[in-house]
């Protein structure tokens, strides 16, 4: 069974992302275990216990960059969607992030990231960047 971690400091945001992931997965006939985290300490303790198959990192600024770098070091095979208020798209490419979203994240943009996971694209697939400036 897939384990999807959602790491964000905002309580309302973690609930929204959990709901979006659950709805998307249900539509596709998948039922992963979704685990919310509101701080990096508890998130990384969970990673050390048992690696996640997928993770959404939605932290501001350098905190997000540090979390993605640390997660990639601990769990090289983890599939990652990274949401940031700063344009770290080059870092995301270097860190083999599956999908990078620049804030503000739209439901449509987040869904595209989830589709990348579902389609099983590898880290060598063309890098996807969503600026949400449509």
Predicted regions and their residues:
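CheY-like receiver
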Residues: 107, 111-134
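Non-catalytic signal-transmission and effector/linker regions of two-component phosphorelay proteins
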Residues: 1-5, 9, 15-18, 124-134
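A short, hydrophobic beta-strand element within the central beta-sheet of small alpha/beta folds
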Residues: 56-57, 77-87
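Acidic, metal-coordinating helix/loop segments flanking the phosphotransfer/catalytic sites
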Residues: 36-53
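A Lys-centered signature of the CheY-like receiver
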Residues: 103
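Two-component/phosphorelay signaling modules centered on CheY-like receiver
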Residues: 11-35
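Short amphipathic alpha-helix used as the core "switch/output" element in two-component signaling
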Residues: 63-77
């Amino acid at each position: 069974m897939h384990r999807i971690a959602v790491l964000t400091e905002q309580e309302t945001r973690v609930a929204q992302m959990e709901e979006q992931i659950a709805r998307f997965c249900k539509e596709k006939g998948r039922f992963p275990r979704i685990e919310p985290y509101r701080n990096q300490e508890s998130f990384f303790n969970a990673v050390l216990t048992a690696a996640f198959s997928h993770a959404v990192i939605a932290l501001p600024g350098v905190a997000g960059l540090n979390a993605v770098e640390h997660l990639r070091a601990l769990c090289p095979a983890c599939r990652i969607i990274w949401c940031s208020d700063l344009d770290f798209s080059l870092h995301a490419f270097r860190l083999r992030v599956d999908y990078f979203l620049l804030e503000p994240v739209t439901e449509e943009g987040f869904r595209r990231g989830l589709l990348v996971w579902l389609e099983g694209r590898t880290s060598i697939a063309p890098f996807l960047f969503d600026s949400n400036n449509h």
